[in-house]
């Protein structure tokens, strides 16, 4: 349960429900550079609906710009996190309302995911360069704010994860687009296990586009701020210069890479389990199997299918449309709310998943998470 405790601490800590503070995202213009600061350091800059509402108009303004007419630098406030996830507790709290109370407020389960995914797509189609600096934890919803932009910078302090299977959910915010496109089946491995990548390994895996040592970050930011022609090519050249200056001996990414590529390229979750069980003398295989057996079986099965389908979809927008469908079906099932209960509410770190085993989940049940929504609820771009 150590992994579940990590998720609890880094996603749900100190999340407030319906904040309207305009100070939760701060903007500063320096020349052609727009600096964006995610400003909830006590909550590890966890993304909430208010922050989505603040960010969306800014990205809408940029739709008509051309490459080179500006550059965005996004960071998290404080020294611990870029953005450690999303406001999942608020969705749980909405579920606990009675029907009369629900009738007096918006369905946050629909509204939050719909607006968040719209923002994710705006970031992914933004014509100007965005540089996201992973100054600490970068997880879940924070990945949706950054990975679809042109550039992501890892530092020694970066900790990346998509830990959603551990809370009975799935790798959303465009996870079905970027994860299957990582080399060596590493995206499938990260999606199913929620494993963390640290420092230079975030770059080696392909999540970050560059690695820059902490000692060079201030100079990097200053050069981007002073850039008079911030085309994607120019910004890439600046980033590459500081990347080349930076030294890192961290390369755990390559540990077990052959086994990850082989095992997580199998045709089913059951086959992945079987292959891990065959590696009796591998501590990595034992720990990986232990992790997979601790997370939601439903999440495992759905995420596996999500990665397979996402690999074939032509665009981020199509992946987000699929993910919105999946998100709403998850909110009709028990595991997400049980995961949040166990990690954030009762904090017993002992979720009771239903069904409790992958052997009790057939393809028909998996397919039900991908069915079109009724009553014109579909997200369409």
Curated annotation (Swiss-Prot):
GO terms for molecular function: 3-hydroxyisobutyryl-CoA hydrolase activity. InterPro entries: ClpP/crotonase-like_dom_sf (IPR029045), ECH_dom (IPR045004), HIBYL-CoA-H (IPR032259). Keywords: Branched-chain amino acid catabolism, Hydrolase, Mitochondrion, Transit peptide. It catalyses: 3-hydroxy-2-methylpropanoyl-CoA + H2O = 3-hydroxy-2-methylpropanoate + CoA + H(+). Pfam families: ECH_2. Residues 1-25 form a transit peptide. GO terms for cellular component: mitochondrion. Its EC number is 3.1.2.4. One of its GO terms (biological process) is valine catabolic process. It is found in: Mitochondrion. Pathway: Amino-acid degradation; L-valine degradation. CDD domains: crotonase-like. Substrate binds at residues 116, 141, 164, 172. Its main location: mitochondrion. PANTHER family: 3-HYDROXYISOBUTYRYL-COA HYDROLASE, MITOCHONDRIAL, 3-HYDROXYISOBUTYRYL-COA HYDROLASE-RELATED. NCBIfam families: PRK05617.1. Hydrolyzes 3-hydroxyisobutyryl-CoA (HIBYL-CoA), a saline catabolite. Belongs to the enoyl-CoA hydratase/isomerase family. This is 3-hydroxyisobutyryl-CoA hydrolase, mitochondrial. The gene is hibch.
């Amino acid at each position: 349960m150590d992994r579940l405790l990590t998720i609890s601490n880094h996603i749900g800590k100190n999340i407030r429900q319906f904040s309207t503070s305009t100070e939760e995202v701060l903007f500063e213009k320096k020349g052609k550079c727009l600096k964006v600061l995610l400003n909830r350091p006590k909550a590890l800059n966890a993304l909430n609906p208010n922050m989505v509402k603040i960010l969306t108009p800014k990205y809408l303004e940029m739709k008509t710009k051309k490459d080179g007419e500006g550059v965005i630098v996004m960071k998290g406030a404080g020294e611990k996190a870029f953005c450690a996830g999303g406001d999942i507790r608020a969705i749980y709290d909405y579920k606990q309302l009675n029907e009369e109370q629900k009738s007096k407020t918006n369905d946050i389960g629909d509204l939050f995911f719909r607006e968040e995914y719209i923002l994710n797509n705006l970031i992914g189609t933004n014509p100007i360069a965005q540089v996201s600096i992973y100054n600490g934890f970068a997880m879940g919803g924070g990945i949706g704010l950054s990975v679809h932009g042109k550039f992501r910078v890892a530092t020694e302090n970066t900790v990346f994860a998509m830990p959603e299977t551990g809370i009975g959910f799935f790798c959303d915010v465009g996870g079905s687009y970027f994860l299957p496109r990582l080399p060596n089946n590493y995206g499938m491995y990260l999606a199913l296990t929620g494993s963390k990548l640290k420092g230079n390994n975030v770059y080696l895996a392909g999540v970050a586009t560059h690695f820059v040592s902490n000692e060079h970050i201030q100079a990097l930011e200053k050069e981007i701020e002073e850039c008079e022609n911030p085309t994607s090519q120019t910004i890439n050249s600046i980033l590459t210069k500081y990347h080349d200056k930076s030294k890192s001996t961290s390369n755990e990414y390559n540990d077990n890479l052959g086994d990850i590529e082989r095992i997580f390229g199998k045709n089913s979750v059951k086959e992945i389990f079987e292959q891990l069980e065959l590696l009796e003398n591998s501590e990595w295989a034992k720990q990986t199997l232990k992790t997979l057996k601790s997370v939601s079986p439903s999440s495992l099965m759905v995420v596996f299918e999500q990665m397979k389908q996402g690999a074939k979809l032509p665009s981020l927008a199509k992946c987000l449309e699929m993910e919105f469908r999946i998100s709403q079906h998850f909110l009709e099932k028990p595991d997400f709310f049980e995961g949040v209960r166990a990690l954030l509410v009762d904090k017993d770190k002992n979720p009771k998943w239903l069904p409790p085993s992958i052997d009790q989940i057939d393809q028909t049940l998996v397919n039900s998470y991908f069915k079109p929504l009724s009553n014109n609820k579909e997200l369409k771009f």
